[in-house]
UniProtKB/Swiss-Prot annotation:
One biological process term in Gene Ontology: killing of cells of another organism
Protein family: Belongs to the cecropin family.
Name by which UniProt lists this protein: Cecropin-A
Organism the protein comes from: Heliothis virescens (Tobacco budworm moth)
UniProt keywords, alphabetically: Amidation, Antibiotic, Antimicrobial, Fungicide, Immunity, Innate immunity, Secreted
Expressing tissues: Hemolymph.
GO cellular component: extracellular region
Length: 35
């Protein structure tokens, strides 16, 4: 029962880390398109 919850928590953390790392790259791409 707890293993499933821990697994979901781990996946959520990975997604959040990915978004945090991707955000600057997305901003740079947006600025590049604006130019």
């Amino acid at each position: 029962r707890w293993k499933v919850f821990k697994k979901i928590e781990k996946v959520g953390r990975n997604i959040r880390d990915g978004v945090i790392k991707a955000a600057p790259a997305i901003e740079v791409l947006g600025q590049a398109k604006a130019l």
